[in-house]
């Protein structure tokens, strides 16, 4: 009975700060590719490349549900 109850799927999220904006991607440019520095947790200090949907600026704090996966670099065809 000492089981922890999760109220939100985002309870395990880890904070990261946007340190660089790499470009826009997606069919209509609706996704922004950014470099994020992890602020807490076991990957603290690690820099990841992530795709973020919606408005984002340098210095924004984003909550990442997981820190294992990285986005592929944007490439010109």
From Swiss-Prot:
The keyword Cell cycle does not apply. The keyword Signal does not apply. InterPro entries: NA-bd_OB-fold, Ribosomal_eS28, Ribosomal_eS28_CS. GO terms for molecular function: structural constituent of ribosome. CDD domains: S1_S28E. GO terms for cellular component: cytosolic small ribosomal subunit. Disulfide bonds: none annotated. Keywords: Ribonucleoprotein, Ribosomal protein. Pfam families: Ribosomal_S28e. PANTHER family: 40S RIBOSOMAL PROTEIN S28, SMALL RIBOSOMAL SUBUNIT PROTEIN ES28. Belongs to the eukaryotic ribosomal protein eS28 family. This is Small ribosomal subunit protein eS28. The gene is rps28e.
